[in-house]
A protein has these predicted regions:
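Central regulatory/effector-binding core of bacterial HTH transcription factors
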Residues: 96-159, 232, 326
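Short beta-strand-centered segments that line the small-molecule binding cleft or hinge
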Residues: 4-6, 91, 114-118, 135-178, ...
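Alpha-helical linker/hinge and terminal dimerization helices associated
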Residues: 48-49, 70-92, 115
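Short loop->beta-strand "edge-of-pocket" segments that line small-molecule binding or catalytic clefts
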Residues: 102, 173-174, 189-211, 299-304
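A late-sequence structural motif
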Residues: 264-309
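A short LG(V/I)-centered, amphipathic sequence patch enriched
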Residues: 46-63, 68
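Short helix-boundary/capping micro-motifs
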Residues: 18-37, 60
Length: 329
C-alpha cells in the first residue's frame, strides 16, 4: 500500500498563513501561535510530503513549485473542512436537518398538527416528513430506519424487542354520528354499550389500521362481528362518510371534539387506547427526534418521568350533544 501523508488541518492553516504573509513571524501572529511552533509544524508538513514548500532567504520567503501546487489544494481542503463543520453544527443545533415522524391517521387529525406547529415555530429550518399508517406498519418502518420517531398504539399484538416506547396518554374512544340522523342510543340513555353496535352500519378504516382492529376486537369480545358498510384510508374520509349518514364510527375523543358530529360516549368502563411514542432501541435518536418528543410531552403536560395522562372524554350532558355546539379546545 502506498504511503499517504497524514497532513493535519492545523499544518495547512499555518502553511497558507505563511504563503499569504510571506513571513513566518507575521504568520505566527495571525494564527496566534508562537513562531517556533509554527515553523516546527511547517517542517513537519514538508517531511510528510517529502518536499520543501518555501524558499527561505533572510527577509524573503517564496513558494517552491511544490508549495505553489499545494496552496490551492490546501485552501480547498480548509474551505471544505469549514463547510463540513458548519453544516454538521447546523444539524446538531437544529438550524437545519430532517425529521421523519410516523403516526396513525387519527393522531394526524388531532394531536400531530399542534405538536408539529410548536416544533416548527422553534426549529423552522428542520424539514418535517410525516407518514400516516397503522402501528404495525410504523413499527416496521422504524425497524427499517425509514422513520426517526413514531406515535403508536400500545400494547402491540406482536412484541418488538428492538423498540423503545414511552406511554403518553390513555385516550377515550367515542361513537360519532351525523347530527341530523337519529342518535345511536334511544330513550333516556346518554351512553352507548359495545353491544349497541351489533347490526349497526359502521364507517371504518381499511384493514391494518389501529381503530379498525380495536373496534373489531371489542365487538368480537361482546360476541358479534361488526358490520362495516364503508371503508376509508383517511380520517377525513371516515368522518365524511359519517357526516353523510353512511354509518357511525368509533373514533378517539380528540378527533371527535373537532369533527362537528354528534358524540356519544361509551358506558363505564368505556373504551380506551394507549398512545405511546417509539423509536429504535438499538440506535440513539437524533437531537431533532429528542426535541420533538420533549415538545410532545410538554404539549400533553407530561414531565420526563410522568405517567401517561388520561385524555378526558366528552363532558356529560344531554343525549345527542354535538361537538360543534361546545367550546373547541
Amino acid at each position: 500500500m502506498p504511503y499517504i501523508p497524514l497532513m493535519q488541518l492545523q499544518q495547512l492553516r499555518y502553511f497558507t498563513a505563511v504563503a499569504d504573509t510571506r513571513h513566518f513571524t507575521r504568520a505566527a501572529e495571525r494564527e496566534h501561535v508562537a513562531q517556533p511552533s509554527l515553523s516546527q509544524q511547517i517542517r513537519s508538513l514538508e517531511r510528510e510530503l517529502g518536499a520543501e514548500l518555501f524558499h527561505r532567504a533572510r527577509g524573503h520567503i517564496t513558494l517552491t513549485d511544490a508549495g505553489e501546487t499545494l496552496l490551492p489544494l490546501a485552501r480547498r481542503i480548509l474551505a471544505d473542512a469549514e463547510t463540513a463543520r458548519r453544516e454538521v453544527q447546523d444539524v446538531a443545533q437544529l438550524r437545519r436537518g430532517r425529521l421523519r415522524l410516523g403516526a396513525p391517521p387519527s393522531l394526524c387529525a388531532s394531536l400531530v398538527p399542534d405538536v408539529l406547529s410548536a416544533f416548527h415555530a422553534t426549529y423552522p429550518g428542520v424539514d418535517l416528513i410525516v407518514t400516516e399508517n397503522g402501528s404495525q406498519d410504523l413499527v416496521r418502518a422504524l425497524a427499517d430506519g425509514a422513520l426517526d420517531l413514531a406515535l403508536i398504539i400500545t400494547p402491540l399484538p406482536v412484541q418488538a424487542p428492538a423498540l423503545a416506547t414511552s406511554e403518553l396518554l390513555r385516550e377515550e374512544l367515542v361513537v360519532v354520528s351525523a347530527p341530523d340522523r337519529p342518535a345511536p342510543v334511544t330513550g333516556r340513555r346518554t351512553r352507548i354499550h359495545v353491544e349497541d353496535l351489533r347490526g349497526r352500519p359502521l364507517a371504518m378504516f381499511r384493514r391494518g389500521y389501529d381503530l379498525r382492529e380495536f373496534t373489531t376486537a371489542a365487538c368480537r369480545t361482546a360476541g358479534f362481528e361488526p358490520t362495516f358498510t364503508v371503508e376509508g384510508g383517511e380520517m377525513d374520509a371516515v368522518l365524511g362518510f359519517v357526516r353523510a349518514g353512511l354509518g357511525i364510527a368509533v373514533v378517539p375523543s380528540m378527533v371527535a371534539e373537532r369533527s362537528g358530529l354528534r358524540i356519544t360516549p361509551f358506558a363505564t368502563p368505556g373504551m380506551h387506547r394507549v398512545v405511546s411514542v417509539a423509536h429504535r432501541g438499538d440506535v440513539s435518536p437524533s437531537r431533532a427526534a429528542r426535541e420533538l418528543e420533549r415538545i410532545l410531552k410538554e404539549h400533553l403536560g407530561l414531565g420526563p418521568s410522568a405517567a401517561p395522562r388520561p385524555r378526558p372524554g366528552p363532558p356529560r350532558g344531554p343525549r345527542g350533544a354535538v361537538a360543534g355546539d361546545r367550546d373547541r379546545p
